């Protein structure tokens, strides 16, 4: 059994990032951050270069470092309203419907770990037609990605130890969180920083099927 197969054969649960991994929300994410940048006199291209992965508060603090707690909360709340209103064009990522259908068919526990607030996570997943049995959102943790708290909580909710859980991510903060939690790190997309590397969720599903078929 090859190394990726050996890794995946040990998995008994799957936790997936939302934006960029399970859901293609790129257009909506960029539109809302572009508008925020313009509202605050910032270069949209500079903001867009770093906004994928971190939670909204982290991005706001990065560009408005002297901001107080009340003003930060106002920015985050306004941004959340804009994000929840702008879900046009949010679609499932390539292979997402097929992967979650296979996980459900196999009765393999799975869920979503996201730096988005729960309200936004439900809106985007709903727009993409994906019903996640477990959602760990930014509202559930004290520290978002790259902190491992979300993945540790997700594994606990699924009832599977992190070492036997695949953490599927596309961004550097997410990959760092999945790794720090002790999960099997699956990098999807352009990143190569994973125990298993897949072009998309179609490929991940094929690898999971092959790994399951090779079990004794």
Predicted feature locations:
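N-terminal helical cap/lid subdomain that shapes the substrate entry/recognition surface
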Residues: 4-106, 117-122
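Residue-level marker of regulatory loop/turn positions in helix-turn-helix DNA-binding domains and
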Residues: 92, 113, 143
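Asp-based, Mg2+/Mn2+-dependent phosphohydrolase catalytic module
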Residues: 1-12, 97, 101-104, 108, ...
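Hydrophobic residues in well-ordered beta-strands that form the structural core
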Residues: 24, 112-114, 187
């Amino acid at each position: 059994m090859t190394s990726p197969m050996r890794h995946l054969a040990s998995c008994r649960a799957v936790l997936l990032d939302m934006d960029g991994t399970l859901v293609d929300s790129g257009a909506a994410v960029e539109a809302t951050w572009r508008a925020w940048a313009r509202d605050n006199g910032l270069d949209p291209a500079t903001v867009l270069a770093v906004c994928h992965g971190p939670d909204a508060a982290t991005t706001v603090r990065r560009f408005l470092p002297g901001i107080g707690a009340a003003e930060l909360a106002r920015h985050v709340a306004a941004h959340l309203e804009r994000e929840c209103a702008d879900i046009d064009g949010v679609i499932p990522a390539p292979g997402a419907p097929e992967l979650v259908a296979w996980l459900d068919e196999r009765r393999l526990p799975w869920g979503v770990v996201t730096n988005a607030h729960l309200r936004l996570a439900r809106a985007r997943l709903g727009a993409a037609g994906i019903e996640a049995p477990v959602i760990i959102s930014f509202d559930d943790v004290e520290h978002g990605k790259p902190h491992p708290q979300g993945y540790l909580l997700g594994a606990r909710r699924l009832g599977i130890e992190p070492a036997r859980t695949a953490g599927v991510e596309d961004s550097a903060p997410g990959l760092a969180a999945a790794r720090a939690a002790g999960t099997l790190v699956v990098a999807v997309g352009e990143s190569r920083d994973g125990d298993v590397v897949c072009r998309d969720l179609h490929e991940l599903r094929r690898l999971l099927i092959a790994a399951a078929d090779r079990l004794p």
